[in-house]
């Protein structure tokens, strides 16, 4: 399995590499507190978004999701290579486009492409409180494999103690490998 960018087109979307012109669209959703609520980072400033965009342009793991009809970049899907022919998938979308099926459409296209390229397993981790995320994974055919209790923290409280969070782990297997 090569570590290459997954690029695809669906009926409504173009899944592609990031480009410099994405800065405003990227800032629009990475600066939104509700969008990044379950992410390991806080809402970003414009300068932080510029640095994030530089990294995204240079990596094969972040895929920009663009609307075909308007060419607006509305979110991203993460496909990171892991051990044993496995990929980790994640997604973040502009709140103005939630509930439109874009996350499902883009993930489905990338999962199909990954499996046709020999990927054996795709997994995702999410916060149990993020019901929309784990419902999406279940709709995509992922199965919940684990509920890890207080296994990770991103932030600390005022006394500098970790704020521990639970994690659900979901996976989907390629039946042809």
What are these model-predicted stretches?
Residues 1-33, 37, 62, 66-177:
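Acyl-donor (CoA/ACP) binding surface of acyl/acetyltransferases
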Residues 34-54:
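Conserved GNAT-fold acetyl-CoA-binding loop/helix
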